[in-house]
A protein has these predicted regions:
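Short, P/G- and charge-enriched loop/turn segments at secondary-structure junctions
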Residues: 1-4, 57-58, 88-91
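Hydrophobic ligand-binding cavity/cleft-lining segments
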Residues: 1-44, 48
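Aromatic-glycine hotspot motif
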Residues: 2-22, 72, 94, 105-114, ...
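Hydrophobic pocket/interface hotspot
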Residues: 25, 35, 53-55, 71, ...
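A solvent-exposed, acidic/Ser-Thr-rich amphipathic alpha-helical stretch
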Residues: 41-56, 60-62
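Hydrophobic-ligand binding "helix-grip"
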Residues: 43-46, 64-112
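Short, solvent-exposed aromatic-acidic interface loops
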Residues: 85-89, 116-123
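A conserved amphipathic terminal alpha-helix motif
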Residues: 119-156
């Protein structure tokens, strides 16, 4: 899995190649049943423009989190993008949303899938850098794209 983090831009980017067609990847990426396999079982996701997204996560030693937002772009089988706001239990939710985008493009032997998380610069002061760095760790620890790859390739 390729990972790049552009600290000056507060941009997180991961990419992986999956041995499957874009349509096969899309089936796992853009369905609740599919997402339950690789992202979370505590998930609400409405797969249409303006649709709601909400995910509950418990991170041992760190706390209980709710991530929520709405679908801003859905272009089968090329892109799924949604806003992302964090609410840690006992704290106020973020005042603004960031953006998470999954993009698919055919490769010679399958599909390149990228995950990009942007918009941290809209958060206030030190919160921007803290959340940016925390989300790099979070996406890596969750092995999000590796989990998607495993789910897609197992279904073939």
């Amino acid at each position: 899995m390729l990972a790049s983090h552009v600290a000056d831009e507060l941009r997180i980017h991961f990419e992986i190649e999956i041995n499957a067609t874009p349509d096969q990847v899309w089936a796992k990426l853009a369905s609740l049943e599919g997402m339950n396999e690789w992202l979370s079982k505590k998930l609400v996701f409405e797969f249409h423009q303006g649709g709601r997204f909400q995910m509950e996560v418990s991170i041992p030693g760190e706390g209980e989190f709710t991530f929520f937002g709405e679908v801003v772009r859905i272009d089968p089988p090329r892109e799924l993008a949604f806003t992302w706001t964090e609410h840690e239990k006992g704290k106020a939710p973020w005042p603004v949303a960031t953006l998470v985008s999954f993009q698919l493009r055919p490769s010679g032997s399958g599909t390149f899938v990228s995950l990009t998380h942007t918009g941290f610069e809209k958060l206030e002061g030190e919160l921007a850098r803290t959340e940016y760095e925390g989300h790099i760790v979070g996406w890596e620890r969750a092995e999000t794209l590796k989990e998607l790859k495993t789910a897609v390739e197992a279904a073939k």
